[in-house]
Structure formats: structure tokens, C-alpha cells
Amino acid sequence: MLDFSKNNLKNDKTKKTLLLNKDFTPVSIIPLSVLSWKESIKLFFMNDIEIIDIYEDILIRSPNISINLPSIVILKKYLNIKNFKLKVDFNKRNILIRDLLTCQYCGKKYQENIFDKNILNNFLTIDHIIPRSKGGKSDWTNVVLSCKECNIEKSDKIIYPKIMPKKPTYYELIEKRKHLPIKISNKSWIHYIQSFWKNKDLIIIEEEEV
């Protein structure tokens, strides 16, 4: 049985493994293709991946072997994502991406960390253009990001944003995702994602985050 104890991990159970396609690009961008330690080790022993980089200070042990936790792995066979239906889920995270952390009424942009779980409580709200009390639906064409001030002023009135919202395509969402921060577990990942996040100030390395 594999040992993933705190002594081996320096209290770091959250470290992820970046999964690359055979062409050395991430398998997906939304979300970024990362694996848990269990998934990466399982794929390794199934001979589906090769290890590109490791966490030198994180060791996983079993009675017969010891192995460093992979930081970056690559598929041995190319996975053609065009064979899959590229679905865009309607959820809070994707609304944040589509609207670029920007109030769609006053245009105020928030620079807060997109990974902050309280962002929709402290800074922005998801507003229904046509309020639900007046029959408005919860879908891509009726919800936008709003700052709290605009949301309070709007109340249950029907006020239209500067640009009417629409459902983004998968590739439109990827283009917008490039303009928002991305959190990574290891700076060795930068080499493989920098073609997507060309502004390196948007790349946040977990152990260096302040």
C-alpha cells in the first residue's frame, strides 16, 4: 500500500500533477488538466504516462518501491480532444471567466484572486438581468457579474448591461481564461503553459503566493 504520510509530504497533500498531451501541451485549459497524486501514480503503473518532472521533496512509499510524486507527466498516446464534445458548463466559475471579473453594469474590474472562494460574497455577485421574481431564468443570456453597489441599486428592476450576455464557446472561454490568474503547483509548469498565459504576472506559484 502506498504511503502518503505528512512526514513524506511536508504537510503537502494538495500538490497536483500537470497532465500533458503527447504534443507537450496541456490536455485541457478549462479546467487545467491536473491530476491528484493517486491518479498520477495509477496512470504511471498502468503504463499510460511518462514522468517528465518530479517533486524532489515529496516521496511516496510502498513496501516494494518508493517514488517521487510526479510534477509533470505526459500521455504516451495522443488524445485528440476534437473527438470529444467540448461542453461549456453553466456555473459560477465560468461566469467569472466569461465576464473577466468585471461588473457588466459600471465596468469596474476586480483584481482579486479568482481562486478566492469568497469573491462572490465580498466583491461581485451574479445578477439576473430579468429578476427571477419576474420570470427571469438562470442561464447564460440572463446572468452577468455585478458589483455589489450596482446590484443594490438595480434591486429587482430590469436594467440591461452595457453588453448583452451570451453563451460562450469553449474556445472563447479559453481566450478569456488566458487573461485571468492561474495557480500552479510547481514553477516547472510555466514552460508548458506560458504559450497560453503569456503574461507571467498572471501565473501564481502556490509556494510563492503571498
What kind of region is each of these model predictions?
Residues 87-124, 144-148:
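Short cysteine-rich loop/turn motifs with clustered Cys
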Residues 120, 130-143:
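Short linker/helix segments within small regulatory modules
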Residues 1-44:
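General detector of N-terminal leader/presequence modules that precede the first folded domain
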Residues 32-63:
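N-terminal juxtadomain amphipathic helix
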Residues 51-107, 179-184:
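Short, charged surface segments at domain edges that flank catalytic/cofactor-binding sites
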Residues 137, 141-210:
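A detector for short metal-coordination/catalytic motifs
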Residues 115-130, 157-165:
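Short cysteine/histidine-rich zinc-coordinating motifs and their immediately flanking basic loops
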